[in-house]
Amino acid sequence: MTKIVNKFALLLCLLALTASLFAAPEAEYRKLSKAYILNADGSQEFRYNMELTLFTHTAMNGTYGESFIVYNPQYQELKINASYTKQKDGNIVKTPDNAFVEVLPRTAADAPAYNHLKEMVVVHTGLELGATIYLDYTLTSKPGYLPELDIYDELLQTSPVKEYTVSLSVPENKPLAYTLQNINSKPTVATEGGMKTVTWKLNNLPASSRDMFVSAANGDIPFLTASTYASNKEALNGLFAQFTPATDVQLNAIAENLTAGKKNDTEKLQAILQHVVENVGYSQVPLRDAGFKIRSINDLFYSAYGTEAEKTNLLNGLLNAAGIQAETAASYRVNADPASLGLNAIKELVVITHADSKQYIMSPTSGKMAAAGWNNQTPVISLTNAGTPVTIPTPDARINYEVSVSVSPEKAESQVKATISDAYLPYYGDNIAAYAGKETSSQTLKANNGYVMVTLPDAPVSLAHSSYCHMNTARKENLLLPCKANEHYAYTVTIPAGMKLATPESVKTIENGAGKVVISIRQNGDKTEVERSLQLNKQLYSPAEFSNLRNLLTEWGNQSNKILLLSVD
C-alpha cells in the first residue's frame, strides 16, 4: 500500500512539473508596434499601439489592468488615439473618461523640481478572460526638448508577442546609427518625402524570463539601440557641457569646508563622497524624463537632493575643486556599436579618481565601489575626456579568513584575521574593520539534548550570503555573477575536556568546469580543523554551464557547512 501511495505522489509531482513547463502564458500581444519619429524641425513623436489578449485572472486583475505613460506636459503632448476592450463575444467597451487618471510619477515623489511631470494611468475596463485590450497613443515632444533621437529598448515583453513592429524615421540627411542584437532580423529601409524609415518586423517573440539576475548586459537578451547624434562623443559632450567647472566659487567654498582638517587625499575623498551620498537626497527621476538636462549645483545646494546625473556633477566638481583630479564616465547597459549608444543606454554614471595611489570607482548614490567596477562586459566611456573608452582593471575578488575558535561550555570565542580585497570594502565609514583586519566575536552556547552547535564566522560579503546560492535547477539565459569569486576560510577550533566533536570528519570536493568547492573537517587532538574554499573560473556563465555552477553555489550556500556539532558529556 505504501508503494502505491509513493508512486501516486510521484505521479502528481511529475504532472505538476509538466504543467508548469508547458503552462500557457498569462496573456499574448497579438500586435505590438513602436514608431520613433524625428522631424526636420527637431520635434519628436513616439507612436505606440498594442493589442493584448488576456488568458488568466492574474493578467486581468493585476498584471495588465492598467497602462502607464510618463511625460512632461510642459514640453510634451499626449494624445490617446484609441483605448477600448474587445470582449470575447465581440462586444466593444470603450475606456471612459474617468479611467484616464493623471498622477505624479513615483520617481518624482520626493523631488519638487520635477513635480510637473505626469504619469497617465490608463485603467482598462470591461476585462474578462479572452478579452483583448486595444491601446493606441502618440507622445509628441516640442523641438529642442529631446536633443536627438535616442533609443534603448529591450524587446521582450512580460508576455509573448505574435507580431512586433519597430520603426525609426529621421530626415534623410540625418545620421542614424542603430544596433539590433540577439535576434535574427534584417530591417527594411525606405525613403519618402525627405524622411528615411528603418523598419523591423519580428514574429513570435517569447515572454521575458522571470528568473533572477537576467540582464541585457549578460549578452543574450534582444535589444535595440539607436541614435542620431553625430557620435557617442557628441552625446556625452552634450551632457558633460552642463557640468559645473571646478573653478566655480560656490563649489570651491563647499569643498574647502568639507575637507578642512583632513590630512591627505584619502580623507578628503571620504568626506566629499560621504557628503554627496548621505547628505544630498537621491531622486530617481531618469535622465530621459528630465529631458537629458540637469539642474545647477546651486539648485542642488538649496534643495538638498538630486538625480543621479546631478549628484554625479556635484561629486565630480567637489573632488576636482579639492585638488583631487576626477574623471566622470558612463557605464552602458549593453555592448553595442558605440555610434548607436546615446544617453538612454547609460546604466550608471561613475566618478573615477586616485587618492594616495588607490583607485576609486564611485557612484554618487553608494559608499561602495560602483557596479561598473565589477562588470567588464559592457563599455565604460569618459565624459571628461571626450568619449574616450575607460579601461577598468578586473577587481581582485579574494577573501581569506584565518579563524581561531576557543570553545567553553558557555560560549565560543572567535579571533578572526581577515584579508578581504579592497573592491569589497566600503570607501568610508567606521565599519571598514568589520570587513577586513582583526576582529573578535563571541557566541553563547546552550546545550540541547546533550549537544551544542558552534557557528563558524565568515565574511559578510561572501557569495554564500547571496541569492546566487539559491537558484532554480535550470536556466535559459546567461548568468553574470557579481565577481569571479575566490574565497578561503581556515578554522582551528579548540574543544575543551568534556566536549567532543560530533560532526563526522569528512572531506568533500566538488570540482567541475565552473570551478571548485572544498569542505573539510578533521580532528587533530583537542583541535578540529575546518577548511572551506570556493574558486570560480569566470564571471559569466552560459545556460550549458549553469548546472555545474549551481552545484558549486548550492553547496557553498549550505549553512550546515558552517556549523559544528559538539557533544557534551
Where are these regions (language model features)?
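Bacterial N-terminal signal peptides
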Residues: A9-S20
